[in-house]
Amino acid sequence: MNAYIEEVIAKVKARDSHEPEFIQTVEEVLRSLEPMIEKHPEYQEAGLLERLVEPERVIEFRVPWVDREGKVQVNRGFRVQFNSAIGPYKGGLRFASHVNLSVMKFLGFEQTFKNSLTSLPMGGGKGGSDFDPNGKTDAEIMRFCQSFMTELQRHIGPNVDVPAGDIGVGGREIGFLFGQYKKIRGAYENGVLTGKGLSFGGSLIRPEATGFGAVYYLCEVLKHENDTIEGKEIAISGFGNVSWGVCTKAMQLGAKVITLAGPDGYIYDPDGVCTQEKLDYMLVMRNSGRNKVQDYADKFGVQFFPGQKPWGQKADICMPCAYQNEIRMEEAEKIIANGTKYYIEVANMPTTNEALFHMMKQPGMIVAPSKAVNAGGVAVSGLEMSQNSERLAWSAEEVDEKLVTIMKNIHKNSMEAAAEAGLGYNLVAGANLAGFKKVADAMMAQGIV
């Protein structure tokens, strides 16, 4: 392994030893960059990797709000502005109890390369809070969002930092956040947030974009293997917005999703989530606040496996769509034993490094990384920014056509970067190399800043 890369990883481990998620993503990305680092000794002279792994700015703040009982609650808010070399900081806001600085830094670091892969001018950032919206009333969520934005508004803007939604932050939350921003700033800057409602500057296809984009990327992988999506059975986790997008597009293209999963377990539907009634019910489940996938089993009379993950279920394709590190060695071994050929990461870093590298070594198994696969969400966010800047609204067909093109190019650029480095069809390394190159070129051109 390259000595410079090892030195930077060691420094990160020593300085950020309490941030396991961040260390994990830094190790995975930097180790895959060896071919490019070897070719460019000027990167070490410029301290490029040291600068790359250090956020430009970390903002941490308290978020006080009043609950339904009139009691004051205090949560912690974050915004990690990781890298602005190729554009304003861009990345979602996550409201979930597991949110901490390590998670925010890992997501912001990944976002930097993901945004670069889209070819759109967006830097990397991420934010959120340890506030859990599950079980909260609309009024409580509104008060929290207003308090959160009262501080965040100091640090964002259409040409500075453009947040969006993520886990726990959907259209309702974006609306509350935008309303508070507009109230405080006294200006209608609809480019300050993406994922907005269509009535105030949002884009068609945005809710579906991450799931749709993941399936479009999958289709490019299948095409490379002289295969097709038609008739394929797909196992996924989650049942939220991303999973719904995957189910919808898979059905449209002739495949079927046979599992959904939540905190309570998973369901197996041999007929697939392949009717409009089932897809509509996924939206009902997501908006109910119950967070139970068993509701699907009860309604449609399919099998429910309490407390289990879906990865023991035989499928042609596995697409984890839930949380980071949901796939460990135990799950990876089940996926391999079932003869799954295509492992397509959709959630951010859903696989531990050990499990990821183990699956990548399996003969005939194709592994695709989340930073490429799930880039459709931020790609359409970028297209929303473009529409806001031009004061235009594109049709769903226009947005979808651009999304297809972006996902095709991400696959093509990743494939070519891996081939150029002599790594064959290694989509994991290829995505890291392709995303890194653009950011590195910009950082080198802009001096030591």
What are these model-predicted stretches?
Residues 20-23, 39-46, 119, 156-165, ...:
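Flexible, glycine/charged-enriched surface loops at secondary-structure junctions
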Residues 2-25, 221-222, 336-449:
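Adenosine-phosphate binding glycine-rich loop
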Residues 106, 160-164, 188-192, 259-262, ...:
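General beta-strand structural signal in soluble alpha/beta enzymes
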Residues 42-71:
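Structured beta-strand/loop patches that form or line metal/cofactor-binding pockets in enzymes
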Residues 96, 115-230:
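Glycine/serine-rich phosphate-binding loop and adjoining beta1-alpha1 elements at the start
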Residues 202-314:
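Glycine-rich phosphate/diphosphate-binding loop of Rossmann-like nucleotide-binding domains
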Residues 265-367, 372:
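Rossmann-like adenosine-cofactor binding region
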